């Protein structure tokens, strides 16, 4: 077996744009609604009850679509927000693996943190485009963390918003 390509967060950041992601997410939602995507609910395991472990969880999210299979593993450890930011340990971390549907061969392993942040906001951008009343000029963002920031980025180019106030307490990211 040939080792799959590893794609770092920096490499993802260099190529993944909302201009490409939002239409792809829109199509994926259409395909899911049409039954073309096999995606069971995510499995979540709690990681915070054993001594020495910070409260958090670990989730696995498999999917099959077209010629590919994929799985995202993600962790959420809210206590990491209290750690020294210089350590670079985030509250959410993820890995995305892409596999061939015909052979099962691993094709790529990607850092999934940025992918997750952008994908979540892109889903909201698709919903906002479908549901936003004509002529709306303001959209409230509930929260002030990483997701609020990414939602503003995703919605900024797709709406004619003049104001996007955030509602929530600011915490260091």
Set out the residue ranges of the language-model regions.
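Short, intrinsically disordered/low-complexity patches at protein termini
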Residues: 130-132, 173
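Conserved beta-strand elements of the Class I
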Residues: 139-140
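Gly/Ala-rich phosphate-binding loop of Rossmann-like dinucleotide-binding domains
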Residues: 152, 156-157
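N-terminal Rossmann-fold NAD(P) dinucleotide-binding loop
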Residues: 148-149
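NAD(P)-binding Rossmann-fold cofactor-contacting core
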Residues: 158-173
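N-terminal ligand-binding/catalytic initiation module
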Residues: 1-117, 123-125, 132-135
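Glycine-rich Rossmann-fold phosphate-binding loop(s) that bind the pyrophosphate
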Residues: 144-145
């Amino acid at each position: 077996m040939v080792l799959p390509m590893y794609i770092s967060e920096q490499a993802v950041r260099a190529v993944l744009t909302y201009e490409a992601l939002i239409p792809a997410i829109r199509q994926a939602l259409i395909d899911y609604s049409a039954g073309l995507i096999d995606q069971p609910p995510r499995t979540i395991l709690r990681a915070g009850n054993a001594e020495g472990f910070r409260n958090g969880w670990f989730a696995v999210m498999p999917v099959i679509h077209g010629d590919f299979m994929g799985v995202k593993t993600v962790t959420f450890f809210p206590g990491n927000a209290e750690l020294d930011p210089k350590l670079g340990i985030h509250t959410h971390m993820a890995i995305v693996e892409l596999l061939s549907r015909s052979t099962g061969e691993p094709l790529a392993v990607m850092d999934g943190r940025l992918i997750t942040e952008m994908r979540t906001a892109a889903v909201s951008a698709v919903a906002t485009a479908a549901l936003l009343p004509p002529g709306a000029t303001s959209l409230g963002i509930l929260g002030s963390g990483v997701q609020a920031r990414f939602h503003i980025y995703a919605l900024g180019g797709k709406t004619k918003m003049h104001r996007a106030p955030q509602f929530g307490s600011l915490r260091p990211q």
